[in-house]
Amino acid sequence: MLLAAMCLALLGCLQAQELKGHVSIILLGATGDLAKKYLWQGLFQLYLDEAGKGHSFSFHGAALTAPQQGQKLMDKVLESLSCPKDLVPSRCDELKGQFLQLSQYRQLKTVEDYQTLNKDIETQVQQDGLWEAGRIFYFSVPPFAYADIARNINSSCRPHPGAWLRVVFEKPFGHDHLSAQQLASELGSFFQEEEMYRVDHYLGKQAVAQILPFRDQNRKALDGLWNRHHVERVEIILKETIDAEGRASFYEEYGVIRDTLQNHLTEILTLVAMELPLNISSSAAVLQHKLWAFQALRGLQKSSAILGQYQAYSGQVRRELQKPDGFQSLTPTFAGVLVHIDNLRWEGVPFILMSGKALDERVGYVRIVFKNRAYCTQSERHWVPEQSRCLPQQIIFYIGHGELGHPAILVSRNLFKPSLPTQKWKEVQDQPGLRLFGRPLSDYYAYRPVREQDAYSTLLSHIFHCRKESFITTENLLASWVFWTPLLDSLAFEVPRPYPGGAENGQLLDFEFSGGQLTFSQQQLEVLIPDLGSVPKPSDFQVLGARYRQSPLITAWPEELISKLASDIEAAAVQAVRHFGKFHLALSGGSSPIALFQQLATGHYSFPWAHTHLWLVDERCVPLSDPDSNFQGLQAHLLQHVRVPYYNIHPMPVHLHQRLCAEEDQGAQTYASEISALVANSSFDLVLLGMGTDGHTASLFPQSPTGLDGDQLVVLTESPFRPHQRMSLSLPLINRAKKVAVLVMGRTKREITTLVSRVGHEPKKWPISGVVPLSGQLVWYMDYEAFLG
């Protein structure tokens, strides 16, 4: 029967057309929800598209279920398959009959089952006089099952040399960078990179799949517009009306950021932001350009995100996971994240990623909003959509649902008339009364697909045709997790804002962005956290003054502490410029000062940057462009946002003559000479220090005498942490400063804070204890967690 079906299927391509070989497609998890809803229909669509074009096919549905029961379940799914509306019914019946005959169920549970499958495929190909082109294994199973299945395929089910193997995986691909690395390493031990296809089904959605072709086909119109000079912002949005009921186990582990932002929305972001390769048909070029886009993403801070949770969620978790009555989940079901890209094209343009459950509508879209610099002298009633520059200018890739109800591409008529392939996209008829993004539909050139197709049908076709650009490579996957993991870690204990769900949300989740920060527009009056007692807010405490090691101590919650320190630095700067015409500020690197840099960049517009010289307290011996470089952190979070003359910026010369911190290059002496030449008496106006958990400060470390005394102003040191080589201001130079501020933040600093408060002047054991300005002032800035624990 199977042979007869194959002969019938190949009848159309036997006339003078050479056969292209046999393809076996094995769907693992063939009776699961994803397979029932999308994958079998997608495989049927693949057969409809490819029947008669030279390949022969066999489809194997596989699961752990016993053969008889599994076949029964699979047959029920196959009977419900449908053809496109434009396919003649008789042709549909014919092809569906062939597909059913070519599809069979088999149990894949043991090594022997995989060996039997391999033998059956080889026997079938030989008996039918065919040659094997390749095999596709689609893993529609939970990730914990990947390793065993991969091992069995690799050992028992690979095709003979000359035939290809393609293995397809569904997310999640880990829950952070480390777990993603581990999974990638495990799969990489069984399969080559070119054999693996990681699915993000949003890349198969028609509007998303059209982003790169649209940019390519409209290069002439977009070349001058697709950049920071013309784009005001980019919104990448996915809203759902449903909640997480029935999926509490999954959602508690992943939450909304891992579920949608880290994958779907980030992949879309790269399609919008990446540089266009010369040939978008080259998978390798597209994937490389996407990777470069990942590498240009500015690191996220806690302040880059806002979180919410619909009010019924914790109750659902308690019921589904048998949690105690008082359990309150911190898992967010809503998130907005502000992303910036540090390159010439997108510098300063906010990319807003937002997704959530239990919202007011189901809709997904990508919206590029252009700056409006026009002023129109006539009243709005005389504005003509095709001509008036005062009307909003935007391009929208409408993913689906919402008021429009279907995928679409919308371009404001006052921008340009886009070019799209007419065989795939057609103009949308106007719908009077329908308004999208503040304008009537008639204000747009609007296009929709000639034939709507689900994402999995598109992706299965791309797998078959080896179009890797629609999938996620190991390198791009890990780059995404490198970007998202620090934010996820910083938000792990953040309490999300509760919201009622649906239309009742009102303006509760509206948010605003400024600089690198997102904040809710509406202040929340009350946060209910059952059984956790009263949770203090920063506003409940004032900035407190005290003394620490005989010097002034400022303590506060982090937000108030950073604000106070920034104000004190500005006051010192204004005073120095008033008296001496310049302000010399030496800054430390690391994570603690980042919030300070951001505060200075976004909240201190009277700061005398034009008269400020910026120096580094210490630097890692890496290129200045390296993410580990202290200068790179300063550049990302401060320098690019303020107007400091470039000749007033003094990075440490750690990279000379193609070498890093080589003593013979005399980088430390060069920096010392520069300080002596520009800073009066080598006395900085203000030095900002931190304190490590081992008592180190700058890059002066315990049990190392380097830089603790003597005449050297700048020294090379060795750190116990990677990268080991450092350059640092010496303790004698630091102590010449007019003011030294030590910033100490976080619960992990509590132990060293207590210890240092009790020791005397012991810089060899605790370098921070050697910070005693000769004639200047030392002030400690500590948050409550560092000071009180």
From Swiss-Prot:
Keyword ATP-binding: no
Annotated residues for binding of D-glucose 6-phosphate: 171, 201-205, 240, 259, 357, 362
Enzyme Commission designation: 1.1.1.47, 1.1.1.363, 3.1.1.31
Subunit architecture: Homodimer.
PANTHER family: GDH_6PGL ENDOPLASMIC BIFUNCTIONAL PROTEIN (PTHR23429:SF7), GLUCOSE-6-PHOSPHATE 1-DEHYDROGENASE G6PD (PTHR23429)
Family: In the N-terminal section; belongs to the glucose-6-phosphate dehydrogenase family. In the C-terminal section; belongs to the glucosamine/galactosamine-6-phosphate isomerase family. 6-phosphogluconolactonase subfamily.
Protein name in the entry: GDH/6PGL endoplasmic bifunctional protein
Organism: Mus musculus
